Regions:
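A detector for short, charged/polar N-terminal pre-domain segments
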Residues: 1-9
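Generic preference for hydrophobic/aromatic residues in regular secondary structure cores
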Residues: 4, 44-45, 64
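A broadly conserved detector of short glycine/acidic/proline-rich loop/turn motifs that flank catalytic sites
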Residues: 10, 65
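A basic, amphipathic helix-loop patch mediating RNA/tRNA/ribosome contacts
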Residues: 12-54
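Short, Lys/Arg- and Gly-enriched loop/turn segments at beta-strand edges
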Residues: 66-70
Length: 70
């Protein structure tokens, strides 16, 4: 399980999280794969590309789990 720190930001959009963590090569790929139902947030399929991911949430994507921290 990987960790991603929001640092001083209150949230990050799901498609940006997938891009900056390297789980997707580009924002376009991230958006397409989210729309295809490949991303889960806290165990539920998430189809909103701009879903705000907050500290404490867990994102699952392509056999990877990312815990978002402050």
């Amino acid at each position: 399980m990987d960790e991603f720190s929001l640092q001083d930001h209150p949230w990050i959009e799901l498609h940006n999280l997938l891009k900056v963590t390297g789980l997707c090569a580009s924002g376009g790929e991230a958006k397409a794969r989210i729309a295809a139902g490949e991303a889960r947030v806290d165990g539920a399929v998430e189809l909103r590309k701009r879903c705000k991911i907050l500290a404490g949430q867990i994102v699952e994507f392509d056999r990877a789990r990312v815990v978002v921290t402050l």
